[in-house]
Amino acid sequence: IDINNGENIFTANCSACHAGGNNVIMPEKTLKKDALADNKMVSVNAITYQVTNGKNAMPAFGSRLAETDIEDVANFVLTQSDKGWD
């Protein structure tokens, strides 16, 4: 697990829609801790699955990112949600 790599992957691939843990497409589906819990996205496996396969307006990144990069970004998201995206 490489949180720094996860941050770099997030910045390059996710921040256009999810900067600061927000969601510009679906404002209620943020990456904040309470929203992740409401949407059952509180594990690396759940986030990894969604990043890999996509859902609704979110594209699938499984063919664009390495599995280890997806795991790193999932760990980064969970770490940031615990810290409040400061």
Curated annotation (Swiss-Prot):
InterPro entries: Cyt_c-like_dom, Cyt_c-like_dom_sf, Cyt_C6, Cyt_C_IC
PROSITE patterns the UniProt entry points to: CYTC (PS51007)
Coiled coil location: none
Short name of one Pfam family: Cytochrome_CBB3
Post-translational modification: Binds 1 heme c group covalently per subunit.
Residues that, per the record, bind heme c: C14, C17, H18, M58
Gene Ontology BP, a term: photosynthesis
Domain of life according to the entry: Eukaryota
Subcellular location: Plastid, Chloroplast thylakoid lumen
Subunit structure: Monomer.
Chain's role: Functions as an electron carrier between membrane-bound cytochrome b6-f and photosystem I in oxygenic photosynthesis.
Matches recorded under PANTHER family: CYTOCHROME C6, CHLOROPLASTIC
Family: Belongs to the cytochrome c family. PetJ subfamily.
Identification of the protein by name: Cytochrome c6
